[in-house]
Curated annotation (Swiss-Prot):
PANTHER family named in the record: ANKYRIN REPEAT DOMAIN-CONTAINING PROTEIN 39 HOMOLOG-RELATED, HET DOMAIN PROTEIN (AFU_ORTHOLOGUE AFUA_8G01020)
Gene: het-6
Entry function: Involved in the non-self-recognition during asexual growth of N.crassa. This process involves restriction of heterokaryon formation via genetic differences at 11 het loci, including mating type.
InterPro entries (alphabetical): HET (IPR010730), HetReg/Transcr_Mod (IPR052895)
Name of this chain's protein: Heterokaryon incompatibility protein 6, OR allele
Species for this entry: Neurospora crassa (strain ATCC 24698 / 74-OR23-1A / CBS 708.71 / DSM 1257 / FGSC 987)
Pfam families: HET
Length: 680
């Protein structure tokens, strides 16, 4: 076995050169390697490397794995034809790939002695040639979709992983046999439908109850949690690699399980969590609580959703949707090269060809250019197809989303998202705002630079006064949270009174009562949040929300008045007194049941504002007087922009999305004066 000390003695001149296996055309050809057999794990690694067209492809297995430490401390010997004989030249590998190849070699040669044909990015792409890498990454979708099989290598067997793999294989196969194949197109991840079809059969209920028990125990003992917390599940490139091939398997140590079995049990966990009736049928004294399933489900279910979209062409996700799903309001997947936040998703995006984005790793292209090109391509594509909400990507750009500083290290324009994992979700849920009125199509204005986005729209007003940021802070379990909530609404009442004193505001509100209702309507963006099946959805508020608000604010005002009582209560809670715990549970039930808290939580970090003409609303936390509230053609919510001194009257920084009371249904769309806005 070649160790790091041996590798260090090999001179650069004696190492494998990619020139010896040059690609005739890196846009149409790939390299493959045949891994040679060996008698035991510690035998040196040998292979031969050759080229092949990607179409039609030969038979090969594509590997999905994690590089780990990129230092190449190990080696594989590559066959080299010399004078009609054969010599072997070393090619350096990372430690993780060395371990992987030794396991795969042993797994393969337990069944047959033929060489194992593989595609592995670390070996088959010249990683030192950025131009070749750019062409080969463009082929990534074809490489993985054309493979005979994709092997997901999770790593050696540790942390009780053999038990997890055995359970997934055994219970997963039995699930497919007794309940049905949820991956068939007519079912497509519809385990709940398959269960409902079989639930009247006693043997099916018996099996499901036992399957629930097995999954429950793996989660309770954290074996499954440790399995899904392996590094492979946290990387971005692995999502694409996992989704593209029909035959995909997980390998962990010397255990192998089909993705289909893991998928079935993953969706079964979702059904248990979401379906109270099913839980009631399957629960036993051995499975007292379903909450233990959450950690495993949250890591796996999105992965299989992406795979489901990918396997059926008419369900393909757009690049915009993928970026939002993976980088907004969640812990984002990891990448080594930041431009792979885009390039690593192109193989999954159904609109990748239409967008015209081509991977480019050359030093002449900057990260800012990659992100700017991506945002502009998405906006222009949506404009072409007259898609409603075609400017939605602007919600994730803006200086309001830059949590570290207004200027970032990539020097992005203000309207381009960083996709850095600190992006907050848009406050808008699934509902019918339409601030742009009937002008559903983005109206792009030509500009002199790709970094400037020109949009046509109208100005609502200029901000003249501000309230405090919304901080829903009850989770700190101190009276400070209640004080902040009460203080926020006291300050907003001040803005409301100023609006009512503004004569121009009389044109905004149909009645005094409607104006008064802005007190509870504006802070939650006129949205009542409810829980749907597996997600949160929203509807427009109505008069019932007034009652919910009165209960909400009265509760927190009571906390503020009883500060000392609250401190005593929290001391009792922390000491574990049952009555205190019960009281906290009832408190949470009350807060959540009426929905006002959830609406306010979706506006977390936003700041109330008042315009010179009496409009009230919520905008990014870094607002300042002089900022403008605007609506762009083709978008259904307003934004806040900031004039750029010395750049002309129409040049602005995009500060972020906003809510503006009295315009969200297009009240100004027909009468407001049109302007051109240039975002830089």
């Amino acid at each position: 076995m070649a160790n790091s000390a041996q590798t260090d003695t090999v001179s650069a001149g004696n190492l494998f050169s990619y020139d010896s296996v040059a690609l005739s055309d890196p846009s149409t050809h790939i390299r493959l390697l045949d891994l040679h057999p060996a008698s035991c794990y510690t035998d040196d690694l040998y292979c031969c490397i050759y080229t092949a067209p990607i179409s039609p492809p030969p038979s090969y297995i594509a590997l999905s794995y994690v590089w780990g430490d990129s230092t190449r401390t190990h080696e594989i010997s590559v066959a080299n034809e010399v004078n009609d004989g054969r010599a072997f030249i070393p090619l350096r590998l990372t430690s993780s790939l060395d371990t992987c190849l030794r396991h795969l070699r042993e797994l393969h040669y337990r069944r047959q002695l033929e060489p194992l044909p593989l595609w592995i990015d670390q070996i088959c792409i010249n990683q030192d040639d950025n131009e070749e890498k750019s062409f080969q990454v463009r082929l990534m979708r074809d490489i993985y979709s054309s493979a005979h099989q994709v092997v997901v290598w999770l790593g050696p067997a540790v942390d009780d992983s053999n038990r997890v793999m055995d359970a997934l294989a055994e219970v997963g196969q039995e699930f497919l046999d007794k309940i049905g194949d949820h991956t068939e197109e007519e079912h497509w991840l519809s385990v709940d439908r398959l269960i409902k079809e079989k639930i009247e059969q006693p043997d099916a209920v018996t099996f499901l109850r036992e399957a629930y028990k097995v999954i429950y125990m793996l989660n309770r003992e954290h074996s499954f949690t440790r399995w899904v917390e392996r590094t492979w599940f946290k990387r971005l490139w692995t999502i694409q690699e996992f989704c593209l091939c029909a035959d995909t398997i997980f390998a962990c140590g010397y255990k192998v399980v089909s993705q289909k079995m893991v998928s079935a049990l993953t969706d079964f966990m979702r059904c248990i969590i979401m379906d109270k009736c099913l839980r009631g049928l399957l629960e036993t004294p051995d499975t007292p609580t379903y909450s233990t399933l959450f950690s495993g489900l949250m890591r796996l279910f999105p992965l299989f959703q992406h795979r489901g979209y990918c396997q059926y062409p008419y369900r393909k996700e757009t690049l915009e949707h993928l970026l939002v799903e993976l980088f907004v309001g969640v812990t984002p997947p990891c990448v080594t090269n930041k431009r792979d936040k885009v390039y690593g998703l192109l193989g999954l995006a159904g609109d990748a060809d239409e967008l015209g984005i081509r991977p480019d790793y050359t030093t002449s292209t900057t990260l800012a250019q990659v992100f700017t090109q991506t945002a502009r391509a998405i906006i222009q594509k949506n404009w072409k197809i007259q898609r409603k909400r075609g400017l939605q990507i602007l919600r994730y750009g803006s200086l309001g989303q830059r949590k570290s500083a207004p200027k970032n290290e990539t020097d992005l324009p203000s309207w381009v998202p960083e996709w850095n994992g600190r992006i907050a979700k848009t406050y808008q849920r699934e509902m019918s705002f339409l601030a742009c009125g009937e002008i559903r199509m983005p109206d792009l204005v030509p500009t002199t630079s790709p970094t400037i986005l020109g949009l046509r729209g109208f100005c609502v007003g200029t901000i003249v006064d501000l309230g405090e940021q919304a901080r829903v802070d009850i989770w700190r379990r101190s009276a400070d949270g209640a004080k902040k909530i009460v203080g926020f609404f006291d300050n907003f009442r001040r803005l409301l009174n100023l609006s009512k004193q503004n004569k121009r505001a009389k044109d905004i509100y149909a009645s005094t009562a409607h104006h008064d209702a802005a007190l509870w309507r504006v802070p939650i963006g006129d949205q009542h949040i409810i829980f749907g099946v597996g997600r949160q959805i929203a509807k427009r508020t109505d008069s019932k929300e007034d009652s919910a608000f009165q209960n909400f604010i009265a509760y927190y005002e009571d906390y503020v008045r009883r500060d000392d009582d609250w401190k005593d209560y929290m001391a009792a809670y922390q000491a574990g007194e049952e009555q205190a715990k019960l009281k906290m549970g009832k408190h949470m039930d009350r807060v959540f049941s009426e929905g006002y808290y959830m609406g306010l939580r979706h506006m977390e970090g936003k700041r109330p504002y008042l315009t010179e003409n009496g409009y009230l609303g919520m905008g990014p936390g870094l607002l300042q007087p002089g900022d403008k509230v605007v609506v762009f053609h083709g978008d259904d919510i307003p934004y806040v922009v900031r004039p750029v001194p010395g750049k002309g009257d129409n040049t602005y920084l995009l500060m972020g999305e906003a809510y503006c009371d009295g315009i969200m249904d297009g009240e100004l769309a027909d009468t407001a004066e049109r302007e051109d806005f240039y975002l830089v």
